[in-house]
Amino acid sequence: MAAVAALQLGLRAAGLGRAPASAAWRSVLRVSPRPGVAWRPSRCGSSAAEASATKAEDDSFLQWVLLLIPVTAFGLGTWQVQRRKWKLNLIAELESRVLAEPVPLPADPMELKNLEYRPVKVRGCFDHSKELYMMPRTMVDPVREAREGGLISSSTQSGAYVVTPFHCTDLGVTILVNRGFVPRKKVNPETRQKGQIEGEVDLIGMVRLTETRQPFVPENNPERNHWHYRDLEAMARITGAEPIFIDANFQSTVPGGPIGGQTRVTLRNEHLQYIVTWYGLSAATSYLWFKKFLRGTPGV
């Protein structure tokens, strides 16, 4: 105790009696502070708290961003349900048109806009001198396609559709009739004279409207008489007919002539696959989101 008292008296004598305890002990222990280094209380605890708060904010933001994936997938699945319903109604409407009883061809061309794929009946005669050729084409064979599981490309034989002006005697107008398919070696009418019908005939065919050129489809070449899609205005100018077009039915086929019934009415309906895909993705990502962010949360 005497030594401690003597030490305190010595410090006071040196003017250090009121110095902070830390400075006094550094003086006693002969520890020199590093230049520029301040002796302050540790902030390790507060820094850890700030980092934890920042991480919590980041996790919360990520949580709601990732929730958009299952929500969006569910919305797309619901949209596909509506699209499938619309497509089924459209298919049913087309089937009812195709199977309907043929009606006389309307005198007003404007009525045809609502009659595509509807059978109509006409009476008149062909003008074989102005044939047009839609090519290349493959033959539509419903019997073979049904036998082979609906394969559209079941026939690989290439050829053309023969489109011939047809003067309707009852209406007094000339229309365009797709008589049907001929193989490439029979495109020249000289090779199928037997099938060039003469005189007045009765026909039943399906109304077809004009087409717009699809991507990757070549342009029509009227100079070479090669038509890749139905441009009714251009075809009408070349032949002098009205822009009215029908596909003759199979019963119009004559020996040595084009094979009629070349109307394929097919609509892709893959919406059920899309429904399963989107709802499945929504369910899977919802489970992962729940497992990542809610599992282990108190009360969940």
Curated annotation (Swiss-Prot):
The keyword Transmembrane applies. Changing G124E: In MC4DN1; reduced protein stability. InterPro entries: Surf1/Shy1 (IPR002994), Surf1/Surf4 (IPR045214). One of its GO terms (molecular function) is cytochrome-c oxidase activity. PANTHER family: SURFEIT LOCUS PROTEIN, SURFEIT LOCUS PROTEIN 1. This is Surfeit locus protein 1. Belongs to the SURF1 family. Component of the MITRAC (mitochondrial translation regulation assembly intermediate of cytochrome c oxidase complex) complex, that regulates cytochrome c oxidase assembly. Changing N89K: In a breast cancer sample; somatic mutation.
